[in-house]
């Protein structure tokens, strides 16, 4: 029996990484918000790898922090090992990754939600939506509670109509033995949304006491770890270590011998999994001649003996998992605490969404995270924040926040999803950005804090601190450009030691810093007037000076991008009857309904010739 359970401005379905950011954003922007989760013990859960960040993903976390999100702060309060990845490459691809204490992270996020003003956290399964005049007006729980709302964010993760598969055993379940979310996916399909099914998987967990780490390679954290959040003042500490081991030919032989028992290859699993996080059986099938694959053995926390075997994701039967694990160095006697499994779940075709992440068909309905076809905690958090902010802005009668590709990785992620769509779980990578030298993780505050400040999620004090930081960067660059250093035996000895040419007469400090062999700190002994600057300022100075030419070129590309994005397309345009467009282009443009010529040009199946037709049409139909 249904009953009236109350009224809220916004309901968020799901309290994973997307739902948390959506709920906090709405509440912090002054809207009465309710966040629903199937299980209160699963708030902020990490059902797969117990880590935050990684290549490309670390950029997302920094960007989210610059906008006013929570993930970076929670990570700094709960992570136990920090590593900066790709330090052997340029600064554009430097990405922070941190091992998290999984339970501490969950508890931290749950506490944050519980203490947030304007936000209620409730355990309930939402099984349907109510629409009034085609717009979201209520959500209904499995127990019959009806909550009147003005907007709703679906952040259902891998729970929606979920099915877990291990070997020939398949059953309805969410991740980690939680309930699956039932009813909602079927209703969304009946409302006209294009739904599909994706798959992901997770490796086994083993008992720390049963593994032999002496047979593995030690993977320590950075000597001087750096935090995720721009507001974290206390340097983080490394409190744990990880280990590296490998599969081998014996492991591969067992997997090959059980090929017909793999749900991925015997027809039990038909949905599409993530390309960049394949199962071990997929790796063996795809790379049959590769003699071994890396496996990282990572702690799930400081107060548990569970160890996560990154790289050993599988849906093979449990007995096969046991057999293959015992062939791996250091895991010969490992006790498996949780077997690996695959999980299928329902999600929406993201081309159903606007760049604000609002549904094109159902006003007031927003999607975020794996519901939108992405994979990963960080991708989910970024989308949850954008969906929550835009739900709040719409209800407040304010202009939406649309993050463009030229703004950063969150904008790139969303543009890829809503413009190009995806046929597999989407993962962010640095290679997806055309402007990655501009979109470094170190300058996310400069790029995005003005937006966070404008929407009210970055305080005046935070904003002014960032402005002061970049004033200091600019002042130091001016000083270095104007400061010369005379030739000396000590200077030239240092230059030769760094395998770069000595100077004759004198040289400007700025010219020396631009040499690839030298860094800002190398020149400190020859720069007595140097001011005492924080490490983040010194880093920004060095990057800007070394890459000035490349940065200038990418900024010109961004200006061209802005011109194309500024050519807006009317919402009422009739693509199906537009003469000159190819049939495929008509169909794609009508389906996606891009907001600008720039967005139209990125749609698969729309050619430069089709864009020329659009430009002619715009010229002929000027108001």
Where are these predicted regions, by residue range?
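Internal hydrophobic alpha-helix adjacent to the cofactor/substrate pocket in enzyme cavities
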Residues: 380-401
């Amino acid at each position: 029996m249904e009953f009236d359970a109350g009224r809220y401005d916004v309901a968020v379905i799901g309290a994973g990484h997307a739902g948390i950011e959506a709920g906090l954003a709405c509440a912090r922007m002054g809207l009465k918000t309710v966040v629903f989760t199937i299980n209160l013990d699963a708030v902020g859960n990490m059902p797969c790898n117990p880590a935050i960040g990684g290549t490309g993903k670390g950029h997302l976390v920094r960007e989210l922090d610059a906008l006013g999100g929570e993930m970076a702060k929670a990570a700094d309060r709960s992570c136990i090992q920090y590593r900066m990845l790709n330090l052997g490459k340029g600064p554009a691809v430097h990405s922070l990754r941190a091992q998290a204490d999984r339970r501490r992270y969950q508890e931290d996020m749950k506490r944050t939600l519980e203490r947030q003003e304007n936000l209620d956290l409730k355990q309930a399964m939402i099984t349907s939506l109510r629409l009034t005049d085609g717009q979201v007006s209520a959500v209904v729980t499995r127990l019959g509670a009806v909550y009147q709302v003005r907007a709703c964010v679906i952040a259902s993760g891998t729970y929606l109509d979920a099915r877990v598969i291990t070997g020939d055993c398949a059953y309805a379940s969410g991740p980690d033995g939680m309930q699956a979310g039932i009813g909602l996916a079927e209703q969304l399909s009946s409302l006209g949304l294009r739904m599909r099914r994706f798959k992901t998987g997770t490796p086994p967990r083993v008992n720390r006491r049963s593994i032999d780490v002496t047979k593995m390679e030690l993977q320590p954290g950075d000597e001087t770890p750096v935090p995720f959040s721009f507001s974290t003042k206390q340097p983080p500490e490394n409190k744990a270590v990880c280990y590296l081991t490998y599969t081998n030919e014996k492991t591969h032989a067992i997997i090959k011998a059980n090929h017909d028992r793999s749900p991925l290859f015997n027809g039990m699993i038909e949905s599409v999994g993530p390309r960049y996080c394949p199962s071990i059986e997929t790796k063996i099938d795809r790379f049959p001649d590769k003699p071994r694959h890396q496996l990282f053995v990572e702690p799930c926390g400081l107060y548990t003996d569970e160890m996560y075997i990154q790289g050993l994701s599988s849906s093979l039967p449990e007995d096969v998992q046991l057999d293959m694990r015992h062939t791996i160095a250091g895991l010969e006697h490992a006790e498996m605490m949780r077997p690996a499994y695959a999980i299928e779940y329902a999600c929406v075709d993201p081309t159903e969404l606007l760049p604000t992440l609002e549904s094109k068909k159902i006003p007031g309905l927003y999607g975020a995270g794996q519901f939108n076809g992405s994979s990963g905690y960080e991708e989910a958090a970024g989308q949850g924040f954008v969906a929550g902010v835009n739900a709040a802005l719409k209800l407040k009668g304010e202009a939406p926040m649309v993050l463009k590709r030229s703004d950063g990785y969150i904008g790139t992620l969303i543009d890829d999803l809503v413009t190009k769509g995806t046929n597999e779980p989407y993962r962010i990578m640095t290679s997806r950005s055309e402007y990655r030298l501009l979109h470094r993780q170190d300058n996310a505050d400069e790029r995005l804090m003005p937006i966070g400040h404008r929407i009210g999620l970055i305080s005046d004090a935070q904003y002014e601190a960032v402005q002061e930081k970049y004033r200091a960067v600019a002042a130091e660059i001016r000083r270095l450009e104007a400061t010369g250093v005379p030739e000396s035996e000590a200077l030239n000895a240092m230059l030769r030691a760094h395998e770069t040419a000595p100077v004759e007469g004198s040289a400007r400090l700025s010219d020396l810093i631009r040499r690839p062999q030298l860094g800002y700190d190398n020149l400190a002994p020859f720069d007595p007037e140097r001011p005492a600057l924080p490490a983040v300022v010194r880093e920004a100075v060095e990057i800007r000076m070394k890459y000035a030419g490349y940065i200038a070129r990418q900024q010109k590309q961004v200006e061209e991008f802005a011109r194309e994005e500024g050519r807006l397309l009317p919402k009422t345009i009739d693509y199906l009857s537009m003469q000159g467009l190819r049939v495929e282009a008509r169909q794609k443009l009508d389906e996606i309904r891009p907001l600008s010529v720039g967005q139209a040009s990125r749609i698969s199946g729309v050619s430069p010739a089709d864009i020329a037709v659009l430009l002619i049409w715009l010229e002929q139909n000027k108001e």
